[in-house]
Amino acid sequence: NNCGGCGFPGCDGLAAAIAAGTAPVNGCPVGGAPVGEKIAAIMGVEAGSTEKKVAFVKCKGTCDKATVKYNYYGIDDCHKIADAVPGGGSKGCNYGCLGSGSCVKACPFDSIHVVDGVACVNPLTCKACGKCVEACPKHLIELIPYDTKHVVKCSSKDKGKDVMKACSVGCIGCHLCEKNCPSDAVHVVDNVAYIDQEKCTGCGICAEKCPKKIIL
């Protein structure tokens, strides 16, 4: 597919690196473990473990949840909007998804679409190539383990009162998730909750306690 998710300039580049012994046989994020195992068999080496990942958008500010500062009519390019449009976009939240679909255009697998103003990933078809991650000027998209138990769907670093003015479902940094987590896996950093997946046991208490229901 030549998506470049492996870090090389296309499939040929990765293949050459594998043959030269400078890249792992399981280096293709799209092919995943099955392809890695086949290449390993051909090369006569161990495939090693491959953790399946999926793209995740850290924003829940849909059209009915996020406020707008003005109506925007212009080019659908998130980078140009972030760089040139007043306030970095029309949404009240300066950290939210711009909804213009640069990630959609970048995805070679048709796995991401803008729904109600926010990019949404289909985890069943996402190949974790990372193209959408590179395409987002707000740095809202990251690759997470496919079996991640709980995630925070917000990226705002504004204080709670400012978040409430901009989005009805934004993290307000109330610390309820942090205070109630029995595994010390959740912490509020820069006014937004973060979950340490190494410590998270999937108990779901943080999601239950979140008043904004942005922990999924």
Task: Indicate residue ranges for each PLM-predicted region.
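Hydrophobic residues embedded in beta-strands of well-ordered beta-sheets
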Residues: 119, 192-193
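Ferredoxin-type iron-sulfur electron-transfer modules and their immediate structural context
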Residues: 1-180, 184-187, 207-209, 213-216
